[in-house]
Design a protein with these regions (language model features):
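A charged, solvent-exposed segment within the mature domains of Sec-exported extracytoplasmic proteins
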Residues: 81-86, 90-97, 102-105
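All-beta strand scaffolds that present successive hydrophobic residues in beta-strands
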Residues: 28-31, 54-59, 76-80, 97-101, ...
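Glycine-rich beta-solenoid repeat tracts in large extracellular/virion proteins
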Residues: 19-22, 40-51, 68-75, 88-96, ...
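Right-handed parallel beta-helix/beta-spiral solenoid domain characteristic of secreted/periplasmic
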Residues: 17-19, 26-71, 79-83
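Acidic Gly/Asp/Thr-rich repetitive segments characteristic of extracellular carbohydrate-active
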Residues: 1-10
Length: 179
């Protein structure tokens, strides 16, 4: 299948064990729920889109006990996802940008990490997320561009460090909640 062909996956409410790599496509990966069961990944999910390809993931639980939850090498849009128990819940590597909206990050060493010197796309609004009980909620080691990361409606609670901004990237927390 051509890398220009978008791939849309509507996943059942089951647990997927082990690591998985989604290759060079535009991805739409959508979880579901059935009673108490929710689409869940317990291994690292790597997203390898190139040259402007991206991934849109929604309604998925990422449950770990170490390692990386989402390992992004492309623009990755997360919505209504939850991350629990990772060394790093979601990371934007070189060429990538990770966006999260309406997501929950709980009990991770690092919840959201940026370590990218370039990106094929940006999405700077981090609206209505909940960061609770993480070592570091947001770690910005390296991030290109001059977009302001907006955390409006997001809640930071009981993290050791809420935002570690080594890159001194512009961040707006005026409408965020700190408990």
């Amino acid at each position: 299948m051509s890398s220009e062909t978008p791939v849309y996956l509507h996943l059942p409410a089951v647990t997927y064990d082990g690591d998985i790599v989604f290759g060079n496509h535009v991805w739409g990966i959508y979880g579901s729920s059935d009673g108490d069961d929710v689409t869940t990944f317990t291994g690292t999910v790597s997203l390898r889109g190139l040259n402007g390809n991206y991934a849109d993931m929604s309604g998925i639980q990422f449950k770990g006990n170490s390692g990386i939850g989402v390992n992004a090498y492309c623009l990755t849009l997360l919505s209504q996802c939850s991350f629990d128990g990772w060394d790093t819940a979601a990371i934007a590597n070189n060429g990538a940008w990770v966006n999260a909206m309406d997501c929950t990050f709980t009990n991770n060493k690092i919840a959201l990490k940026f370590n990218s010197s370039m990106a094929y796309g940006t999405a700077p609004n981090y609206l209505n997320n909940t960061f609770t009980g993480n070592g570091t909620a947001v770690c910005i080691e390296n991030l290109p561009g001059n977009e302001v990361l907006d955390f409006a409606g997001s809640t930071f609670s009981e993290n050791d460090v809420d935002i570690d901004n080594k890159a001194e990237h512009s961040v707006d927390t005026a409408k965020a909640n700190f408990e």
